Curated annotation (Swiss-Prot):
SUPFAM superfamilies attached to this UniProt entry: Periplasmic binding protein-like II (SSF53850), Porphobilinogen deaminase (hydroxymethylbilane synthase), C-terminal domain (SSF54782)
Catalytic activity as recorded in UniProt: 4 porphobilinogen + H2O = hydroxymethylbilane + 4 NH4(+)
Pathway entry: Porphyrin-containing compound metabolism; protoporphyrin-IX biosynthesis; coproporphyrinogen-III from 5-aminolevulinate: step 2/4
Known role: Tetrapolymerization of the monopyrrole PBG into the hydroxymethylbilane pre-uroporphyrinogen in several discrete steps.
One GO term describing the cellular component: cytoplasm
Top-level taxonomy: Bacteria, Pseudomonadati, Pseudomonadota, Gammaproteobacteria, Pseudomonadales
GO molecular function ontology, one term from the record: hydroxymethylbilane synthase activity
Obligatory cofactor(s): dipyrromethane
Keywords annotated in UniProt: Porphyrin biosynthesis, Transferase
Leading EC class: transferase
Gene this chain is encoded by: hemC
Assigned protein family: Belongs to the HMBS family.
Name by which UniProt lists this protein: Porphobilinogen deaminase
Amino acid sequence: MSSREIRIATRKSALALWQAEYVKARLEQAHPGLLVTLVPMVSRGDKLLDSPLSKIGGKGLFVKELETALLENNADIAVHSMKDVPMDFPQGLGLFCICEREDPRDAFVSNTFASLDQLPAGSIVGTSSLRRQAQLLARRPDLQIRFLRGNVNTRLAKLDAGEYDAIILAAAGLIRLGFEDRITSAISVDDSLPAGGQGAVGIECRSVDAEIHALLAPLHHEDTAVRVIAERSLNKHLNGGCQVPIACYAVLEGDDVWLRGLVGDPSGSVLLHADARAPQTSAQALGVQVAEALLEQGAADILKAVYGEANNE
């Protein structure tokens, strides 16, 4: 096995490269002598920075180019933020490893105010996420939400330049890039339910590569995987992607998993909630159950309107 080489397809953003380097280090630690190299590339989502994700539309904005590299044998594995990974994979590819989850919460970042509750009426908050926007405006309808895209450094620079009073980012990304001190306050999952898979890193590879699967096995974290399976099952049943106002978060309680789901109107006028518990072995069915409970409350109408707006742009 010492002569084996693994090529990691990764986006070129600082956070994506951190994740790829993390996987590289874990593989080298688990398999001394293994040669691991990075194959950096630019995704469609990285190029289209002048529009909100909800307006670009489509799924797999941050993964398609990496999957093409796998299919054309230009890479052996692809490392993804799980919240960016579509529910379905191209034929011949699959998700074979989910690493231990980092902090899944959203982070409130401001140079002036200590928390979301302390923001004065009319304050400008930056985010490109309809999920965050819906929950923010439901709690604070007096805030102004302003579009914010770009990598973590770019977003922090825009805050520091005074374009925003505060911005909302994933806590995991800030922690991984060494910006933990920029987190003014972490937002409780009760106040801002995360995106499915937020904070977790997943590894995709070719389904037939049994040798690669074996090399990845030491990196797999089963507790995280069970939680992410439940969350992704909910997302899939709602036909969700990373650009729609769907939130879901699972935690383990003994042998059970508790899944909370949310669908929100981007205006904050309506937030639909549902939750349920099931044995960990039924995580996938649990996702469908909670998704169905949201659909019974009218989630399809909210999501149809969001998709309609994206298609009309």
